[in-house]
Swiss-Prot record:
HAMAP family given in the database record: DNA_HJ_migration_RuvA
Positions of region (Domain III): 143-196
Family: Belongs to the RuvA family.
Recorded name of the encoding gene: ruvA
Domain notes: Has three domains with a flexible linker between the domains II and III and assumes an 'L' shape. Domain III is highly mobile and contacts RuvB.
Keyword DNA damage listed: yes
Domain of life per record: Bacteria
Descriptive protein name: Holliday junction branch migration complex subunit RuvA
Pfam families xref list: HHH_5, RuvA_N
Keyword Membrane found: no
Taxonomic placement: Bacteria, Pseudomonadati, Spirochaetota, Spirochaetia, Spirochaetales
Length: 196
């Protein structure tokens, strides 16, 4: 199995990236969120999943272990192969997916293009409890703990800030943002909600 590839991104295609790991070039299928985080000619470390069948050999790439873990759990669901799993992770970011499973939010999963209520229900039944480590929503929000404290220091009630964070983080607008843009969006939207 190929666990990880270090190299330079030399091309970005619709659903893949090309990495030069001298002397080889690898085409790696990635989610749209993963692709948005990567820049051409950037040196990267991509975690991989090597898919091998008699008639199909593909390499799938991920920014971190959590994204790969969600992918591997998804392909364990009957009827969901690697391409479908990647399509799901292109429609909903891996950490939001984990949060949706933890919060039993089947509607968020079923909003992904090509995933209806039936498949979303199947995913939920198979993965319920598998992706949750403690309070998933709390671990998801740890990234924004300093931002939360900053807003509380402005005189807002912590409970209201946390509620606003959770609602905003599950919104479509938040989920399509690059990680670097999420904090600013969360700050602005939280202040809008709390200032009403």
């Amino acid at each position: 199995m190929i666990n990880k590839i270090y190299g330079k991104i030399v091309d970005k295609k619709e659903s893949s990236i090309i990495i030069l790991a001298f002397p080889f070039e690898f085409e790696i299928l990635v989610s749209s969120f993963c692709k948005m985080e990567l820049r051409l000619l950037e040196d990267v470390e991509i975690l991989t999943y090597f898919h091998f069948r008699d008639d199909d050999v593909k390499l799938f790439g991920f920014l971190n272990i959590s994204e790969r873990e969600v992918f591997e759990n998804l392909i364990g669901v009957d009827g969901i192969g690697p391409k479908a799993a990647l399509k799901i992770l292109s429609g909903i970011k891996y950490d939001a997916f984990r949060l949706a499973i933890a919060k039993e939010d089947i509607n968020l999963i079923s909003k992904v293009k090509g995933i209806g209520n039936k498949i979303a229900g199947k995913i939920f039944l198979k993965l319920r409890g598998k992706l949750v480590k403690g309070d998933e929503s709390s671990s998801y929000m740890l990234k924004f703990k300093e931002l939360e404290q900053s807003i509380v220091n402005m005189g807002f009630d912590r409970k209201l800030v946390v509620v606003a964070f959770r609602e905003i983080m599950l919104s479509d607008k938040f989920l399509i943002l690059k990680e670097a843009e999420q904090e600013q969006f969360l700050f602005t939207e939280t202040l809008k909600r709390l200032s009403v």
